[in-house]
Amino acid sequence: MAKYRAGRINEEVKKEVSNIIHNDIKDPRLSAMVSVTDVNVTKDLKYAKVYVSIFGNEKAKEESLEALKSSVGFIRKEVGRRVKLRNTPEVIIEVDNSIERGMHIDELLHSIKENESNDN
């Protein structure tokens, strides 16, 4: 039962944080495409680690990350207003590079396949 509740809370917080980032944060530094990939809320509901994937050049990534980190208070307030929980979790922004790593692995596999077809 507890696992099911934790999963529901994680998904609800993920949905709301994504909506807040895309619709409510008006920071001009948030120019790169930001995707919320996962959220892990601790069992005591005190902390929520929000994993984001940021697409764009390095400068845009850094600026977007700074914008997100400076907006954690606003994000927390909005999550508390939109998701009815006993405690509003402290939001911690973490960068998730798994999508970029997956794209890199896909490129490597594609180049290996091309090399094998050229050898034959």
From Swiss-Prot:
Gene3D superfamilies documented for this protein: 3.30.300.20
Gene Ontology MF terms in the entry: ribosomal small subunit binding
Protein keywords: Cytoplasm, Ribosome biogenesis
Subcellular localization: Cytoplasm
Gene Ontology BP, a term: ribosome biogenesis
InterPro entries per the UniProt record, alphabetical: KH_dom-like_a/b, RbfA, RbfA_dom_sf, Ribosome-bd_factorA_CS
SUPFAM superfamilies for this protein: Ribosome-binding factor A, RbfA (SSF89919)
Predominant localisation class: cytoplasm
Signal peptide residues on this chain, from the entry's feature table: none
One Pfam family from the record: RBFA
GO CC, any one term: cytosol
Family assignment from sequence similarity: Belongs to the RbfA family.
NCBIfam families listed in its UniProt record: rbfA (TIGR00082)
Subunit structure: Monomer. Binds 30S ribosomal subunits, but not 50S ribosomal subunits or 70S ribosomes.
Function recorded in the entry: One of several proteins that assist in the late maturation steps of the functional core of the 30S ribosomal subunit. Associates with free 30S ribosomal subunits (but not with 30S subunits that are part of 70S ribosomes or polysomes). Required for efficient processing of 16S rRNA. May interact with the 5'-terminal helix region of 16S rRNA.
Family annotation (PANTHER family): RIBOSOME-BINDING FACTOR A, CHLOROPLASTIC-RELATED (PTHR33515:SF1)
Protein name: Ribosome-binding factor A
Species the sequence originates in: Clostridium botulinum (strain Hall / ATCC 3502 / NCTC 13319 / Type A)
Species lineage: Bacteria, Bacillati, Bacillota, Clostridia, Eubacteriales
Gene name for this UniProt entry: rbfA
